[in-house]
Amino acid sequence: METVKKPIDLNEIKTLIPHRYPMLLVDKVIDHEPGKTLHAIKNVTINEPVFTGHFPELAIFPGVLILEALAQATGILGFKSTEGRGDNEMYLFASIDKAKFKKPVLPGDTMHLHVEFLKERRGMWKFYGEARVDGKVVCSADLMCARRPL
């Protein structure tokens, strides 16, 4: 039996997280299971503003922005796992542990962002995230987020 995918388009993403260009780093959600997992993508292009300085001779997508893309994916999963986003609230990136960068992400790459909900305790949500390019892990980390008013 084939499972039905649950995509989320860019318009809905923008109702769930407050980020906008150039800091909106999730292009679309391929699939998600509320309370469990989310698979999203970020298409990295040479037109990203960051590439004018990182680095002019060899454009490499910054690791901190890969982590930010994973954090945005956790916010989307968080809101899709609960009653949704209320007025003037968001998930704040609270901490990161065990971050590893294994390969550079270059213009033209499609990053597949995979996040998994691990647990919630006292309003803090813990996730495991991986960014993959061509099926290979380029970054992994444990991320903590907190749902808070703006």
Swiss-Prot record:
What is the main EC category here? lyase
Q: Where is it located?
A: Cytoplasm
Which is an annotated GO molecular function term of this record? (3R)-hydroxyacyl-[acyl-carrier-protein] dehydratase activity
User: What keywords is this UniProt entry annotated with?
Assistant: Cytoplasm, Lipid A biosynthesis, Lipid biosynthesis, Lipid metabolism, Lyase
Q: What is the active site of this protein?
A: 54
The reactions it catalyses are:
a (3R)-hydroxyacyl-[ACP] = a (2E)-enoyl-[ACP] + H2O
Q: What GO terms describe the biological role, i.e. biological process, of this protein?
A: fatty acid biosynthetic process; lipid A biosynthetic process
Q: Which GO terms describe its cellular component?
A: cytoplasm; membrane
Q: What is its EC number?
A: 4.2.1.59
Tell me the function of this protein. Answer: Involved in unsaturated fatty acids biosynthesis. Catalyzes the dehydration of short chain beta-hydroxyacyl-ACPs and long chain saturated and unsaturated beta-hydroxyacyl-ACPs.
Query: What family, per the record?
Result: Belongs to the thioester dehydratase family. FabZ subfamily.
Protein name per the record: 3-hydroxyacyl-[acyl-carrier-protein] dehydratase FabZ
What species is given as this protein's source? Answer: Colwellia psychrerythraea (strain 34H / ATCC BAA-681)
